[in-house]
Structure formats: structure tokens, C-alpha cells
């Protein structure tokens, strides 16, 4: 009885919120499946109308978004289903081909594949063993056999080290035999201008011959003036010690001009120096100190050239001196 009285006493306070939410309920019931106006919820009666409107808007938007998500996922699922159907069709065709093959044919195919793989691995092991034999560590004390990857890495390091050593050796050889040789032999002895005999040495044929055989040596340490003075002193000593009545012509007139003289000044200076009336050329060849010159101009000609090139007037004199 007390509960019934409380319900009756509390009933007059409820119509006010019901009257407030009546338009909203009628609007919501028009789009829903429930058409009765007596169906009500206790939640709208407890909440203000503004909050309930926001909740309804949020629920409507949430209802729209899941539809979109479902639509996108539906497209993805359709594409994935297409690809899976293609792969399944290919697998089924392969299975059909294998099913069409008999059991002996399948066994033969498996044996062929296994033999091919076995041969490939056998060749690889032989190649790796050959590589291990030529590695430097193979000739040392007995060590554990390296794996394939370790052997390949070690071989790579050795190849890089040997390449660097070879490049360094080439550079050193080019500096030793290339740079200095090119500095002392300009244009590979093609345009060399060996110094002609000095004017003081052209007074006597023997001095001219000595000057032609031994041109002025330009020592890399001595200055050019000292080298010229030393050459003049050597020519004077030879002229004082030579026979005064010698009828032999000068070696400069005997030897033909060098064929490697390509520059006009050097080619013109060679015949003038050989005749005994020319002036000395200034640009001489820088020889190595204490070492013979490798070019053919500084080499002593063989004796048969002297005999064949001698004049006809000097031969009777030689025979008379011999008698």
C-alpha cells in the first residue's frame, strides 16, 4: 500500500518532462517501426532536450559512418576475393596436371629435380674447396675448415688488398722509370740536340773527333758553366796529346747526321759541328752521372764504319805507314 501510494504521489510530477519530449518522441516515432505514442523511455525524461538532440545527431552520424566503412571494406573484400579465386584456379589447374600424371611419372620428376640439385651442390662444393686450397691460410697449421660465406669474404679481402698493392707498385714504377726518364730524355730522344764541338776543339781533327764522340756532359748537380769548362779542358788535353800529322778526317764528318734529329735547329747544328766550323748548340742532353747514355747517338760506332767511310786519299797513306 505504501508503494502504491508513493507511485500515485509521484505520478503528477512526471507529465512535465513527458510534455517536453512529446514533439521529439513523435518525430522519432515517425521514422521508426514503433508507432505508438505511449512507448517512452526513462532516459529522455532524465536528460535535457539539448543533450538528447546532440545524442541523436551523434547516433545518426555513427550510423552513417559504419555504412561507409562497410562499403570500403566490401570493395577490398571483393578485390581480395578475385585474387584468391585466381590463385585457387591456378592451384587447381596445377593439381589437375599433377593428378593427370601417373605415379611413376611423378617419381621420375622428383628424381630428376633431386639429381639436378645434388649436382649443383656438388659443383659448388668442389669450387669452394679449390678456393680454399689457394688461400694463404691453407698452407699454415691445421685449422678448422671455413664455411662458404667465410671463405668468400676472405677471398674478397685478399683481392682488394692485392689490387691496392698492385696499384701502389705501378705508381712507384712510373715515378722511378717514367718521370725521371721523361725529364732526362725529352720526347723520347726524338728532338734531342746534343751539344756540338766547342770552337777551341775544332782547331785539330783529333780534338774534333773526341768532342764528337764525347759531347759536353751536363751533370745534374754541376752548373752549366762548370760542365762547359770541364768539357773544354778535356778537349784541350786530347788536342795536346794527339799526333800533329794525322791525316784522318774528323769523326763528325765520318758519321752521318743522326736520323732522330727532328727539330730544324738540331738538324742544322749537327752537320755544322761535324764540318768543324759550326758553333756549339746550347740545349744539350742531360746524361746520368757515371752511366752511359742509352740513345744511339752516344754509342761508339763499330770499326767497319770507320774503314768504309774513310776517304780514298787516306788509305794509301795508311798502307805506306804500315810498310
UniProtKB/Swiss-Prot annotation:
InterPro entries: bHLH_dom (IPR011598), bHLH_transcription_factors (IPR050359), HLH_DNA-bd_sf (IPR036638), Olig2_bHLH (IPR032658). Keywords: Chromosomal rearrangement, Cytoplasm, Developmental protein, DNA-binding, Nucleus, Proto-oncogene, Transcription, Transcription regulation. Transmembrane segments: none annotated. Required for oligodendrocyte and motor neuron specification in the spinal cord, as well as for the development of somatic motor neurons in the hindbrain. Functions together with ZNF488 to promote oligodendrocyte differentiation. Cooperates with OLIG1 to establish the pMN domain of the embryonic neural tube. Antagonist of V2 interneuron and of NKX2-2-induced V3 interneuron development. It is linked to A chromosomal aberration involving OLIG2 may be a cause of a form of T-cell acute lymphoblastic leukemia (T-ALL). Translocation t(14;21)(q11.2;q22) with TCRA. The keyword Transcription applies. PROSITE patterns: BHLH. The bHLH is essential for interaction with NKX2-2. One of its GO terms (cellular component) is nucleus. Residues 76-93 have a biased composition (Low complexity). It comes from Homo sapiens. Induction: By SHH. Also induced by NKX6-1 in the developing spinal cord, but not in the rostral hindbrain. Residues 108-162 form the bHLH domain. Interacts with NKX2-2. Interacts with ZNF488. It is found in: Nucleus; Cytoplasm. Residues 1-107 are annotated as: Disordered. Pfam families: HLH (PF00010). This is Oligodendrocyte transcription factor 2. One of its GO terms (biological process) is axon development.
Amino acid at each position: 500500500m505504501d508503494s502504491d501510494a508513493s507511485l500515485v504521489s509521484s505520478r503528477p510530477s512526471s507529465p512535465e518532462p513527458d510534455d517536453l519530449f512529446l514533439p521529439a518522441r513523435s518525430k522519432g516515432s515517425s521514422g521508426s517501426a514503433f508507432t505508438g505514442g505511449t512507448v517512452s523511455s526513462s532516459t529522455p525524461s532524465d536528460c535535457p532536450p539539448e543533450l538528447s538532440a546532440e545524442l541523436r545527431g551523434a547516433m545518426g552520424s555513427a550510423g552513417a559512418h559504419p555504412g561507409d566503412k562497410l562499403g570500403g571494406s566490401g570493395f577490398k573484400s571483393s578485390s581480395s576475393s578475385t585474387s584468391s579465386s585466381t590463385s585457387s584456379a591456378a592451384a587447381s589447374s596445377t593439381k589437375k596436371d599433377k593428378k593427370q600424371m601417373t605415379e611413376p611419372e611423378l617419381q621420375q620428376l622428383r628424381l630428376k629435380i633431386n639429381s639436378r640439385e645434388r649436382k649443383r651442390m656438388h659443383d659448388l662444393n668442389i669450387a669452394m674447396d679449390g678456393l680454399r686450397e689457394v688461400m694463404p691460410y691453407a698452407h699454415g697449421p691445421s685449422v678448422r675448415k671455413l664455411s662458404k660465406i667465410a671463405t668468400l669474404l676472405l677471398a674478397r679481402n685478399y683481392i682488394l688488398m692485392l689490387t691496392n698493392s698492385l696499384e701502389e707498385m705501378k705508381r712507384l714504377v712510373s715515378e722511378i722509370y717514367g718521370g725521371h726518364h721523361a725529364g732526362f730524355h725529352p720526347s723520347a730522344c726524338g728532338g734531342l740536340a746534343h751539344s756540338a764541338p766547342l770552337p777551341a776543339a775544332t782547331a785539330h781533327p783529333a780534338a774534333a773527333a773526341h768532342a764528337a764522340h764525347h759531347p759536353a756532359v751536363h751533370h745534374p748537380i754541376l752548373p752549366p758553366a762548370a760542365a762547359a769548362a770541364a768539357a773544354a779542358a778535356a778537349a784541350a788535353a786530347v788536342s795536346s796529346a794527339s799526333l800533329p800529322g794525322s791525316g784522318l778526317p774528323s769523326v763528325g764528318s765520318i758519321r752521318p747526321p743522326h736520323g732522330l734529329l727532328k727539330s730544324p735547329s738540331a738538324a742544322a747544328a749537327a752537320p755544322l759541328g761535324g764540318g768543324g766550323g759550326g758553333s756549339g748548340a746550347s740545349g744539350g742532353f742531360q746524361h746520368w752521372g757515371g752511366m752511359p747514355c742509352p740513345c744511339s747517338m752516344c754509342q761508339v760506332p763499330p770499326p767497319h764504319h770507320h774503314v768504309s767511310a774513310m776517304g780514298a786519299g787516306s788509305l794509301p797513306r795508311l798502307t805506306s805507314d804500315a810498310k
